[in-house]
């Protein structure tokens, strides 16, 4: 049960003839996973038996192979420090320390501290955050502390949440989102979603400086403790779609959004326990569970939304800001088909039955919608050119 190193001109067989050769290989659909993902006792990972990966050291090709499942503690394998930081993405590397192969975990997405591109190879990653406890049968149904699906004994299912390495955030070279956007979870074999409502990584600007027109510049992210971008920054559905496409992402359809949000508790009128939904709220707040609304840091005492998480570990599906989807419909409340000048200056026109005849669905609810917020909540009364201060989004992409 160990990593082994093969090297051109050193071992009996050259890398070119080693059976596993070919960039990387593994047995099955993945090679990196969380240990006992439904027990929640340990934050350890397993590198599966049969994994192999190539590395070019600037002179010759080398290959690492794994014989036997290799269990490791990411915190003990950090390049810096010995504790995993909450709300962060980590990357797993195979690195060469002299002639000894080892596993190194880092916040760096390029290569770990103490190594470079010729002595390390990124093979996967994970996110540290909140985790909803779910059934052990592979169906990912929320459970109470006795293991009953949607149960109310002990710790009721809505409150049965913990923290650690999010099991369905673990990715590798075989099992990964098409775009390594960061802050993502796997929803099913075909779909990955951002954990958080998207926020600004780079400020968004528009054609002619006019909100809602074509995006000139900007970049979004999925990150803990940030304010989600909305119409406050000038964005409508078209803009979210443009920004997503530029970064290799896309908007969710309504049915996909429901899959992401499944297992999120319904919002409440009188509290922010299950989402930023209290009817006295007056504005959006920062992303994430147990978040300090002022600093964006995790606050286990006064942080809001401690249980605002879905079965697949997406946060804020109920409340905070409505989330644009790509699903549209037609509004036939009036049927005077004509060219409608609604798309913005220099954007063309829309031939519709009325000036609001192309609704785009938004989901989840907003910051003061209370019990109207939930994992199927949908609003079909808004159109994609609408710039609204309480409309944000969540991004997705297909599996590689």
Language-model features, listed with the residues they occupy:
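Elongated alpha-helical scaffolds
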Residues: 84-105
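Glycine-rich, flexible loop motifs
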Residues: 21-86
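Disulfide-stabilized, aromatic/cysteine-rich ligand-recognition loop
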Residues: 231-235, 252, 344-400
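Acidic glycine-/aspartate-rich tracts in secreted/extracellular proteins
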Residues: 96-101, 197-200, 327-330, 367, ...
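Short aromatic-cysteine micro-motif
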Residues: 145, 152-315
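Cytochrome P450 core scaffold surrounding the K-helix E-X-X-R motif
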Residues: 204, 325-339
């Amino acid at each position: 049960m160990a990593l082994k190193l093969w090297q051109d001109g050193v071992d009996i067989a050259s890398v070119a003839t080693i059976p596993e050769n070919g960039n990387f290989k593994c047995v099955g659909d993945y090679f990196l996973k969380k240990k006992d993902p439904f027990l929640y006792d340990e934050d350890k990972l397993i590198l599966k038996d049969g994994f192999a990966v190539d590395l070019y050291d600037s002179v010759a090709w080398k290959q690492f192979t794994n014989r036997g499942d290799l269990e490791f503690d990411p915190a003990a394998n950090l390049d810096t420090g010995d504790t995993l930081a909450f709300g962060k993405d980590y990357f797993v590397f195979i690195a060469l320390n002299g002639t000894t192969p080892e596993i190194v975990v880092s916040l760096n997405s390029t290569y770990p501290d103490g190594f470079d591109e010729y002595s390390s190879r990124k093979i996967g990653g994970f996110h540290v955050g909140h985790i909803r406890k779910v059934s052990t049968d592979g169906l990912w149904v929320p459970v109470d502390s006795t293991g009953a699906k949607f149960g109310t004994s002990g710790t009721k299912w809505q409150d049965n949440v913990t923290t650690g390495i999010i099991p369905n955030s673990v990715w590798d070279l075989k099992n990964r989102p098409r775009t390594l956007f960061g802050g993502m979870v796997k929803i099913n074999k075909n779909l990955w979603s951002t954990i958080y409502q998207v926020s600004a990584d780079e400020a968004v600007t528009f054609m002619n400086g006019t909100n809602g027109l074509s995006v000139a510049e900007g970049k979004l992210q999925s990150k803990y403790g940030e304010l989600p971008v909305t119409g406050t920054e000038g964005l409508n559905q078209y803009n979210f779609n443009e920004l997503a496409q530029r970064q290799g992402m896309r908007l969710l359809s309504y049915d996909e959004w429901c899959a992401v949000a499944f297992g999120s508790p319904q919002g409440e009128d009188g509290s922010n326990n299950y989402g930023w939904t209290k009817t006295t709220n007056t504005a959006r707040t920062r992303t994430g569970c147990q978040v300090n609304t002022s600093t964006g840091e995790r606050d286990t005492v006064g942080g809001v939304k401690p249980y605002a998480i879905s079965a697949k570990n997406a946060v804020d599906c109920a409340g905070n800001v409505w989330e644009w989807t790509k699903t549209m419909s037609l509004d036939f409340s009036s049927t005077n088909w004509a060219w409608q000048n609604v798309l913005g200056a220099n954007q063309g026109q829309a031939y519709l039955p009325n000036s609001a005849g192309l609704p785009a669905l938004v989901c989840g609810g907003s910051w003061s919608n209370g019990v109207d917020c939930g994992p199927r909540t949908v609003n079909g009364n808004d159109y994609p050119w609408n710039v609204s201060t309480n409309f944000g989004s969540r991004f997705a992409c297909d599996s590689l």
